[in-house]
UniProtKB/Swiss-Prot annotation:
Keywords: Acyltransferase, Cell shape, Cell wall biogenesis/degradation, Cytoplasm, Magnesium, Metal-binding, Multifunctional enzyme, Nucleotidyltransferase, Peptidoglycan synthesis, Repeat, Transferase. This is Bifunctional protein GlmU. It catalyses: alpha-D-glucosamine 1-phosphate + acetyl-CoA = N-acetyl-alpha-D-glucosamine 1-phosphate + CoA + H(+); N-acetyl-alpha-D-glucosamine 1-phosphate + UTP + H(+) = UDP-N-acetyl-alpha-D-glucosamine + diphosphate. One of its GO terms (molecular function) is magnesium ion binding.
Amino acid sequence: MAKVAAIVLAAGKGTRMKSELVKVMHPLSGMPMISWPVNVVREAGAAVITLVVGHQSEKVREFFADQGDIVFASQEEQLGTGHAVACCSEALSGFTGAILILCGDVPLITPETLQTFLEYHYRQQAVITVLTTCMDNPYGYGRVIKDAAGHVTEIVEEKDASAEQRQINEINSGIYCVDAGFLFTAVADLKNDNAQKEYYLTDIIKTAVAERRTCCAFPIADPMEVMGVNDRVQLAEAGRIIRVRINKALMVAGTTIIDPETTYIDHGVVVGRDTTIYPNVCISGGTVIGDNCVIESSAVIKGCKVGDCVTIKAGSVMEDSVIGNTVAIGPMAHLRSGTELRDEVKIGNFVETKKIIMGAGSKASHLTYLGDATIGSHVNIGCGTITCNYDGVKKHRTVIEDDVFVGSDVQFVAPVSIGRNSLIAAGTTVTKDVPPDSLAIARAPQVNKEGWKLKNK
C-alpha cells in the first residue's frame, strides 16, 4: 500500500462531558480516549500521525511525548474541522500520499475497517473517500448527497439541510481519506458561509466536484464503529463495546470468563490459557496472568505479573505486585505496591503486604500486616503478626531468614533481623535481632490468682 499519514482532531473541549478534563483525555478501558483512534490509524499503516490540539494541549502533548511517529499542530481557536485540518499544513508539508482524517472522540473504529477503507480509496482512484454508514435515526449527522453514478457530490450538515435532504439516512462518519496534494490547497480556500459560521472540511467535496475529480463513499454496516463520544453516557457505552471485544478475544484464545458482562478487563492485559475468571473481577494496568489460574469474584488486580497455577480468592486486591507459580492469595487479601511472592506462597484472609519479598513455600494465613520486609523460604507467619515498620519519621525493614516459625500475635519492631530456623513465641514483641536456631520470647509470665473473682465481688 502507498504511503499514508493521519490527522486526528483533538482540539475541542468537550463541554457536554461536564468535566475539568478535556474530553479526549478521559479514561476508556485503560487508556485515554484519544489513544484508541491513534493506535488504530497506526495499525492501519499511518507512518506519521498529526494530532490537532487546542484545549489542555499540554496534557495531550505530555501523554504522547515519547511516541516518535506523532507530531502536533495547534488550533488555538476552534473554527471548524476545515480550519483544524488547515492547521496541519506545516506539519505535513511535503507529504505525498493519502491522509486519513478522523476525530479523537471516535474510539470504536477498527484497524481492519480502516485498512479496507484505504484499499477501496486506492482502487477507486478517488481524491476524497468518505466513510459512511446508514442510521435509522440520522438526526444531528451530516447527510451524504450522491449523483446518479453513486459518487459523492456534497455533504450537508443537519442545520443546513433541506427537509428532503434530512430524509437521507446515509450519514457522514467524520472519517475521510484525502489525497494530500489536493487537501491543503482545498482547505486554504474554504469559506464559512453556513449556519455555524465554521469552516467545514466537508466543503472540499464541492471543490473536488468542481474540478471533476472522483469523490467516493465507503459505507460500513455497523454504525457503532463510528459512534462519537460526546458525554459520559456515550463514554460508558463505548467502554461496554470495547469490553465485549477484549473479553471475546481472551475467550477465543483460551481463557474462561464465567460472565463476560460483569468482567472488566482493560486494554493491554494478558491472560493465559485455561485460566478461569469469575464475575465482578477488575483487571487493569497491563497486568499479565499466566496459565491455569483461578480469579474468584470481586478480585481487583492492577499492574501485576502473576505466574501459572495461581489462585486469587474472592475480594482480594492486588497492585503492582509480582506473583510466582502455584501461589494462593485471599480471600480478602490486600497486596500493595512492591509485593513479591515467590513460588508456592500462601497469603490468607485479611493479610496486607507492602514492599515485601516472601520466599518460596512461606505462609501468612490470616490477620497479618507485612510491610518493608524480606522473608525467606518456608517461613510460617502466625495470626496477628505485625511488622512495625514506621517510627514516625522513617520506614525500616524487617528481615526474617529461612525456616523461621512465627507464633501468633507477634510484633517485629524494625529494624530487626531474625536468623534462620528460629522460633518466635506467641505474643512476643521483638525489638532486637534474633540469632539463628534460637527461641525468642518476650512477654510477662502468666500469674494465676485463685479465688480472686470471688473475693472481689
